[in-house]
Design a protein with these regions (language model features):
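Short aromatic-glycine-(Arg/Gly/Cys) micro-motifs in beta-strand/loop hairpins
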Residues: 1-19
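Surface-exposed loop/edge segments in extracytoplasmic proteins
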Residues: 15-21, 56-61
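Short, mixed-charge low-complexity intrinsically disordered segments
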Residues: 38-66
Length: 66
């Protein structure tokens, strides 16, 4: 986990990691997740994932199915 926060958001498009962000608040991270889907969801091959870095558990992904 980074000092920036426990909740890690990633955007992968066409198999390349494009963006990362970390937040201490799950509520804030989920808001960012929704914003990223709206802003970047139309990129070819986009996959957005929110992970709890403390447990290693993916909390949500977009799109829902790979």
């Amino acid at each position: 986990m980074t000092t920036a926060g426990r909740y890690h958001l990633t955007l992968v498009a066409d198999g390349r990691e494009m963006l990362h962000g970390w937040w201490a608040s799950e509520a804030v991270a989920r808001g960012k997740f929704t914003a990223w889907v709206g802003r970047h969801g139309d990129r070819p091959g986009a996959r957005i994932t929110l992970t709890d870095d403390e447990t290693g558990t993916p909390l949500t992904t977009w799109p829902d199915s790979a």
